[in-house]
Amino acid sequence: MACAGLLTVCLLGPPAPQQPRHSAPAAGHALFQDVFRRADKNDDGKLSFEEFQNYFADGVLSSAELRELFSGIDDHLTDNLETEKLCDYFSTHLGVYRPVLAALESLNRAVLTAMDTTKLEYEQASKVDQFVTRFLLRETVNQLQALQTSLEGASDTLEAQAHGQRLDEETIKAQSRPCGSRRAGRRALRSISWSPSWSPGSSDTGRSSEAEQQWRLQVNRLQELIDQLECKAPRLEPTHEEDLTKGFDSHILVAQRQVQVAEDALQDFHRALCCYMNFTGAQSHCLHVSAQKMLDNAAFTLYEFWQDEASWRRHQQSPCSKAFQRTLIDHLQAPDTLTTVFFPASWWIMNNN
């Protein structure tokens, strides 16, 4: 009996060691990886202090303070900070934004799934189903834009308070001195558009710069799909020897913007361009908006047709237009060229066929 028991023990052997369980990635980890990958210009998985400073400089922290922060995260003092360490550092400081970033990651997956399905099924769907799809996309965009506006308002307010001065004063100073960091350049073009009722002590949505970027990314993706689903075409027909009348509505304004996009930023720029064109085309005083891309390079020409100059100038101050101008700062190889010209309003004939 003892031999049988010993034989059983030998056959069974010791229990297999349990495999260690890998914990799920922390909320926002994937988002941070994507963000810091863009900051890593040479794609070596690390940030030098120069790369760190170029990306994080906001005009508030001094270079010495940024160096102190960099050294505090880079505990080995290698002067090359691994992006994973940056992810871990910010993950420990998420606070109330932990569920926000987790929701953004879930939203990103859900939107991509919905868009892929829409691209496959839209053309074969009935007219009613196509109408419903466009309606749902528009409403989704509206909800995201509302959240984005709240985030941008909070962001602008906090940055203004951090500088201890009004944003319009910051804009004037930024225009009168050499351009600093990428983020400082963005502020120089940002309009005074925050909600006046929001303050850091209020209970409304707070600031999360990465959350703001993700909301804008989702809006751009949805707007790009809407732009693919709907299209209108204009034509101009001049009359001969026409007697022109004077007045604010006697001429239309055509604005031409020429841009040269960096090759590695084409995808992000195209999304932002589609978002801007969709928003602009929906304005009541905008007659038409269209864009052309050169086949042999990354050059684009954007055309906007407006009922009058005043409407176009008001549009230039809108949050969407300001966001597009910030995109130009980030993604262009050289400053854009903007030209405006007036045409007799009677030349404009809209082709609805």
Curated annotation (Swiss-Prot):
Q: Name one Pfam family in it.
A: ABM
Composition skew (Low complexity), residue ranges = 193-203
What keyword terms does UniProt attach to this protein? Calcium, Golgi apparatus, Metal-binding, Phosphoprotein
Where it mainly occurs, coarsely classed, is Golgi
* Single annotated GO MF: calcium ion binding
Q: Which GO terms describe its cellular component?
A: cytoplasm; endoplasmic reticulum; endoplasmic reticulum membrane; Golgi cis cisterna
Which parts of this chain are annotated as the region Required for interaction with APBA3? 172-181
Q: Which SMART domains match?
A: EFh
**Compartments, record wording:** Golgi apparatus
Q: Where is this region: Disordered?
A: 193-213
Q: Where does Ca(2+) bind?
A: 40, 42, 44, 46, 51
Q: Which InterPro entries match?
A: ABM_dom, Dimeric_a/b-barrel, EF-hand-dom_pair, EF_Hand_1_Ca_BS, EF_hand_dom, NECAB1/2/3
User: What happens to this protein after translation, modification-wise?
Assistant: Phosphorylated by NEK2.
- Domain of life assignment: Eukaryota
Expression across tissues is: Widely expressed, with highest levels in the brain.
Q: Which residues cross the membrane?
A: none
- Domain EF-hand: start-end pairs: 27-62
Function statement: Inhibits the interaction of APBA2 with amyloid-beta precursor protein (APP), and hence allows formation of amyloid-beta. May enhance the activity of HIF1A and thus promote glycolysis under normoxic conditions; the function requires its ABM domain and may implicate the stabilization of the interaction between HIF1AN and APBA3.
Spell out the protein name for this chain. N-terminal EF-hand calcium-binding protein 3
Organism encoding this protein: Mus musculus
